[in-house]
C-alpha cells in the first residue's frame, strides 16, 4: 500500500469536513475549499479521522491513493493555517508595490508589469524587494508565486531577477578574454 495513502488524517478542532459522493468540502477559520476526487477512491470519516481506501492494487489506483490523501491533507492545513510563499526581487532598481488589489513590478522592462491575483489569493508587499503570496489553496498559492517569478526569472550571470525566498541560483562564469 501507499505509505502516504495509509496514513490516517486527523481533522483538527475548528475544521469540518463534509463528504457528498466523492466531493470533499473542508471548512475552517481561514475559508472553505471544495474538490471532487476520482470515483474509485473510497473516502471515509469516522470519529474526526479521515481515511482513503483504494479498490485494487493496480498502478493507477496506487498513484491516486496517495495523491488523494495528500490533497485532502493540504485542504485541511490550508483552511486551518493557510499557505504562504515568499519571493525576493534582486537587481538594481527592481521593486514591487501594491496598487489596490494589483501587484505592480518594476523589473527592468520599459513598462511596469501588473499582476492581478485570483480570488482567494492575497499578495502582500512587506518591502520593495519582498513579495508574499498567501491563500488557503496550496496549488493556487504556488501557481501564483510561479507566475510572478516567471515575469523575470533569475539569470545565472549576475543573479538578477525574481526568486523564491531561500532559492539558490546556480551562477555561471562569464566569457574569459584571450
Curated annotation (Swiss-Prot):
Q: Which UniProt keywords apply?
A: Ribonucleoprotein, Ribosomal protein, RNA-binding, rRNA-binding
Keyword Oxidoreductase listed? The answer is no
For this chain, one GO molecular function annotation is: structural constituent of ribosome
Q: Identify the GO cellular component terms for this protein.
A: cytosolic large ribosomal subunit
Biological process per Gene Ontology, one example term: cytoplasmic translation
Signal peptide segment: none
Q: Which SUPFAM superfamilies match?
A: Ribosomal protein L6
Which domain of life does the UniProt lineage start with?
Bacteria
InterPro entries tied to this protein: Ribosomal_uL6-like, Ribosomal_uL6-like_a/b-dom_sf, Ribosomal_uL6_a/b-dom, Ribosomal_uL6_bac-type, Ribosomal_uL6_CS
Q: Which family does it belong to?
A: Belongs to the universal ribosomal protein uL6 family.
**HAMAP family the UniProt entry points to:** Ribosomal_uL6_B
How does this polypeptide assemble, per the annotation? Part of the 50S ribosomal subunit.
Protein name, UniProt field:
Large ribosomal subunit protein uL6
Organism from which the protein derives: Bacillus licheniformis (strain ATCC 14580 / DSM 13 / JCM 2505 / CCUG 7422 / NBRC 12200 / NCIMB 9375 / NCTC 10341 / NRRL NRS-1264 / Gibson 46)
Q: Lineage of this protein's species?
A: Bacteria, Bacillati, Bacillota, Bacilli, Bacillales
Q: Provide the gene name from the record.
A: rplF
